[in-house]
Amino acid sequence: MLFLKNVPLQNLTTIKIGGRVSFYAEPSDLKEISLCIDFSKSRDIPLFVLGNGSNTIFGDVRGLVVNLKNLKGFKVKEIKGKFFVEAFSGTPLKDLIRFSVKENVKSFYKLLGFPASVGGAVSMNAGAFGVEISDFLKEVYFVDWEGKLQKAKRDELNFSYRKSPFPKLGIVFKVVFEFERSKENILPKYEKIRRIRKEKQPINLPTSGSTFKNPEGNFAGKLLEKAGLKGFRLKNVGFSEKHANFLVNYGGGTFSEVVDLINIAKERVYENFGIVLEEEVKLIESSGSDGWKVLGA
């Protein structure tokens, strides 16, 4: 298992911003995940699980970051017209999207464009165009905080808008999806969503994806745009000119710049509309002796 000290984190997130973490590990199996949990307990430091880093921005952190990128791959069983897909946590979500399009699977293609791992997508209950990844879950295997592998069926787990029981319950190890073939050709709809993503999202700049959750009955992007924040820039970071809810790094952005920008956005939206935006992106930094300070968790 790769295990390092004092590791820079900016290249481990999609926005390419980050400080350093005290310890960093890349486990490849269940035993090594358990060792990471034991290590964090023995040092009395917090542990944070990293997937593809698509909705996470780090400051300087006293703790252990566990990257699950080596836990990847999936296998498929087809039973009576349904696909049961077992995927490890570090599997890129795009690999399953590609499979679902090839097999004409109903609705899963709507999750295209998330640069996330399977475990990360499940942990944040990623969703778009009226579907959430939890809609397709059959069961989840996870490592609890005692280092033991557990299994839970979908109806035993509480998912809601951009929330899941993970990592509170433990570390997602692998999941089983249940897919159903569509009766109609999904390819035109898939291509339409792909065009929308390309036109409306900053695919050519480092980004953390959606910055804020949509308030009930509204859209964060529209509120930010009406508040004059579309294309707004603060030093080396800003909100995309394509989509106001996408935070981008123009090069050399820092964690403190991100925090300042997010605070400005929240203040402006509240002043204009009386709505308090909640972070979807996780901002993680050390907070004295108590370890992590996490916004958007």
From Swiss-Prot:
Q: Which residues form the active site?
A: R162, S210, E280
Swiss-Prot/TrEMBL cofactor(s): FAD
Its subcellular locations are: Cytoplasm
| Its EC number(s) | 1.3.1.98
Q: Where is the FAD-binding PCMH-type domain?
A: 16-182
Keywords for this entry? Answer: Cell cycle, Cell division, Cell shape, Cell wall biogenesis/degradation, Cytoplasm, FAD, Flavoprotein, NADP, Oxidoreductase, Peptidoglycan synthesis
This protein's GO cellular component annotations are: cytosol
Which EC class does it fall in?
oxidoreductase
> Can you tell which superkingdom this protein's organism belongs to?
Bacteria
- Specify the pathway: Cell wall biogenesis; peptidoglycan biosynthesis
The answer to whether UniProt assigns keyword Lipid biosynthesis to this entry is: no
Concerning its family, UniProt says: Belongs to the MurB family.
| Known role | Cell wall formation.
Name of the protein in its database record:
UDP-N-acetylenolpyruvoylglucosamine reductase
Q: Which organism is it from?
A: Aquifex aeolicus (strain VF5)
